[in-house]
């Protein structure tokens, strides 16, 4: 489980291959543990749960600002999503969710300085953070056109600098600025260490698994879940495109889905979808009650099974 590595980094610093995990979450764990004199594990849980609570409040306000989104429905859809139990675990999902939601909310309010600062923290937490620049940059262009507003433009350029800062550290520490990519194969799941695999190849691989592995095998079940989540996410974005949602929302959420697939696998995509915040706003705009009934029934069932397996120590994403 990733949480073990975050706790190890917080306590001992990076060891071989752990560069795959971005640094801000373990740094905050270490800081909280020292000032509060608590264990690293407890500090991590406090950070995750507090971040998610605050992030959820901001998410609700963001939904209220968004045309066509239904705020309460969006919150419920997020809470019952099959992998949402990770928000309470020692993973970066909660911290990233908080930062990314504030970035999008601040962008909608045209508070670009705040968006830039939180975007910097987001890209120091997860690779997806750099794609927030698309949302903020798109809104900047809608407000200012191509005119230069120095303070706001420079603020938005902070967003990718979180990733840049980590890459500079990696170059200094291990001589490889993209060690977070090259270390991926060490953690299994069939990821490549830098070779790009096109999505059609990945889908073909999953098709072969589902047609050659016996259906009662755990491998088949995991592959089916990962593929279904990916296709569901892409379908929601297609519906959003047809409905005329902001192109920046669609691009960002699409990047969250597609970029992991470029490593040759859809492993963890169901969990990464929690980072695709606009996806849940789009979901909340659907009008079919039958769809929401089926969504809730399936999501809650998978949530219960996934959480039970996770609590027993199984890797479920």
Segments the model singles out, each with a brief description of its role:
Residues 23, 27, 35-57, 86, ...:
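Loop-to-helix entry region of an early transmembrane alpha helix in multi-pass inner-membrane enzymes
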Residues 89-95, 269:
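Short acidic/glycine- and proline-prone juxtamembrane loop motifs at membrane-interface regions
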Residues 133-142, 146-239, 245-253, 306:
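Membrane-lumen/periplasm interface segments of specific transmembrane helices
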Residues 58, 77-80, 95-114, 133, ...:
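Specific aromatic-rich, kink-prone transmembrane helix
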Residues 69, 103-114, 141-144, 287:
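Membrane-interface transmembrane helices that cradle and orient dolichyl/undecaprenyl
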Residues 1-38, 201-202:
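Short hydrophobic/aromatic helix or loop-helix immediately within or flanking a transmembrane segment
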Residues 30-31, 46-66, 231-239:
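Transmembrane-helix motifs of polytopic, lipid-linked glycan transferases
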Residues 39-43, 59-80, 114, 244-251:
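Transmembrane-helix signature of polytopic, membrane-embedded enzymes
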């Amino acid at each position: 489980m990733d949480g073990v590595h975050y706790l190890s980094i917080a306590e001992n610093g990076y060891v071989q291959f752990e560069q795959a995990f971005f640094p801000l979450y373990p740094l905050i764990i270490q800081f909280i543990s020292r000032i509060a004199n608590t264990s690293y594990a407890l500090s991590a849980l406090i950070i995750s749960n507090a971040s998610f609570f605050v992030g959820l409040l901001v998410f609700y306000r963001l939904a209220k600002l968004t045309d066509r989104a239904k705020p309460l429905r969006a919150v419920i859809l997020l809470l019952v999503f099959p992998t949402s139990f990770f928000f309470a675990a020692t993973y970066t999902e909660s911290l990233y969710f908080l930062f990314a939601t504030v970035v999008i909310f601040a962008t909608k309010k045209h508070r670009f300085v705040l968006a830039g600062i939180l975007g910097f923290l987001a890209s120091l937490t997860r690779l997806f953070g750099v794609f927030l620049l698309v949302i903020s940059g798109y809104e900047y262009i809608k407000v200012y056109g191509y005119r230069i507003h120095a303070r706001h433009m420079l603020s938005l350029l902070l967003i990718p600098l979180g990733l840049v800062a980590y890459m500079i550290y990696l170059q200094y520490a291990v001589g490889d600025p993209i060690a977070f990519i090259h270390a991926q194969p060490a953690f299994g799941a069939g990821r490549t260490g830098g070779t790009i695999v096109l999505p059609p190849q990945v889908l073909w691989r999953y098709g072969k698994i589902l047609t050659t592995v016996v259906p009662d095998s755990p491998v088949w079940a995991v592959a089916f879940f990962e593929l279904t989540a990916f296709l569901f996410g892409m379908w929601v974005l297609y519906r959003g495109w047809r409905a005329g949602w902001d192109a920046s929302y669609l691009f960002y959420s699409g990047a969250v889905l597609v970029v992991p697939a470029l490593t040759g696998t859809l492993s963890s995509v169901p969990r990464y979808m929690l980072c695709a915040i606009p996806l849940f706003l789009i979901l909340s705009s659907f009008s079919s009650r039958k769809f929401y009934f089926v969504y809730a029934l399936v999501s809650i069932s998978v949530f219960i099974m996934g959480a039970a397996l996770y609590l027993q120590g199984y890797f479920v994403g």
